[in-house]
Amino acid sequence: MRILVISDTHGELGNFLKVMDIEKKVDLCVHLGDIEGQENEIADLVSCPLFAVRGNNDFFSPLPYDIDVKIGPYQAFLTHGHHYGISVGEGGVLEEARARGANLVMFGHTHRPVLREEEGIILVNPGSISYPRQEDRKPSYMIITINERNGKAEFEQKFLKS
């Protein structure tokens, strides 16, 4: 199973189209907020199930703020992160993930990639493919590949070339 994880597209589809051209087929797409009204367009472009959460710029969106979902061997907690103080640190999302029984938390909002494990919980932020804020400012996303036979997952942070 190949999972595309993106966040903070902010209504800009140009780099998303580049990502889809590179990645071709994915089995699941996760959008972690600030989709700005383009959930239908993105769902049509990926031609697979889409889990999308509401970000701080999705003012009138019907999307949920959080999703709890089983993805492969993981109990995943999906959120934009702004309700959990992600701008000042990851403590709030970690605490919420623990409370929900999650061993994988995916979040956005900061526009900076994160991939690490703390206290048995994997933290994933794909960064932003539209407005990256990390030092090199390369648009970023993540591909998670789950081996269907043994359940092992490979997390790959990817960057678009300028």
For every predicted segment, state its role.
Residues 47-50, 120-122:
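Glycine-enriched alpha-helix->loop->beta-strand junction motifs that scaffold or abut catalytic
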Residues 17, 72, 95-101, 124-162:
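Binuclear metal-dependent phosphoesterase catalytic core
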